[in-house]
Amino acid sequence: MKRDERGRRAYEGLMGVPAEEAFDDVRRISPQMYETVLDGAFGGPLARAELTRREREIASTAIVAAIGGADRRLASHVRGALRQGVAPHELLALAEHVAVYAGFPRALNALDVVHEVLQGAGVPEQPALHRVQLSDHETVVAQKGDHGPAVILSHSLGVDWRMWEPVMERLSHGRRVFAYDFRGHGGAAGAPRPFSMDDLARDMGGVLDAFGVEQAHVVGLSMGGGIAQTFAVHSPERVASLALLATTDHAFDAFEGRARSGEVDGMEAQIVPTLTRWFTAPALATNGWGVQYARELVRRFDPADWAAAWRAFKGVDVQGKLAAFQAPTLVLVGEEDYSTTPEVMSGVAERIPGSTYQVLPGTPHMQTLEKPELVADALDRFLPADR
């Protein structure tokens, strides 16, 4: 293949549009420049596979933003980055990163360009972030929606509130949706240790108090589901409904071993067993944003926080304690969840009389990161809204 043809293919693969269309003005004004760009750049280093297309667009976006004065080209690379699966919040983080090395004026300009491109692409606004002081630590709460019933989302062990981001936009239509970081995670990393499920349930109440919410629809996934159940046991009057995703009402023998492994073997050793427990093989092979996000969070996790969280989860003790729970309850299990299996989750449902049990086809443990559309459909049908 000739170098210029390789350049055309590389450009269209990165940007999604033919080079002739994107560089029409350049080709008319300076055919030599047009050929130089295609041959020297897109037919050369940008056509090689040492860096993925996603990595190249992240790098190109950062470089053009740092150079400054090239807004049209920056916008083109932002669109290319979106095409390569870079998430909107990653592009915003990239602009923030530019501030460290290229200064605030260029970073602020990059934020403007990113925002304009996202708006033009119809990408919803990012959730509003609030810093909230709880009894003995600070946390971060993300909010989408400003009217309607309140919904609070509690994430899985090992991640943070962004686990819910793929479903928050959908759920926020006619609802106020709050996703927060619980102790030892995200904005609440390093909170006082050790802690218990009761502490975590009190923190959930503290988040609701901070926003003046007396009663909420409570949704939890995995350990977040354990927190949700504990909160429902202690404060049933504050729970308008309960949605339990990929969770358990009793501890597993493996929990202590996972805590010890984090302390002894370090976090790099947790990546393979954790991600293969959370995702399907095709998702791991595709390596989309959800897998990358989860992998990086596990890798960066403080081993002390990791161990404290598993030991808290080891103390989950709600089995049979919701037998008299009156609020509507949804139990949502992934067909391909080999951690909190359909057998485990059907037991949870059986011990909450009147609950609705639903199996999501082809879905693993980390439901919102691999099959967000199925989760959003199920929760949107279950949760009331003002529309």
What are these regions (language model features)?
Residues 165-169, 178-220, 377:
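Active-site loop/oxyanion-hole signature of alpha/beta-hydrolase fold enzymes
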Residues 252-254, 266-323:
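Conserved alpha/beta-hydrolase catalytic His-Asp/Glu region
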Residues 325, 331-333:
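Short beta-strand/loop motif that positions the catalytic acidic residue
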Residues 363-372, 376:
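Catalytic histidine-centered segment of alpha/beta-hydrolase-like enzymes
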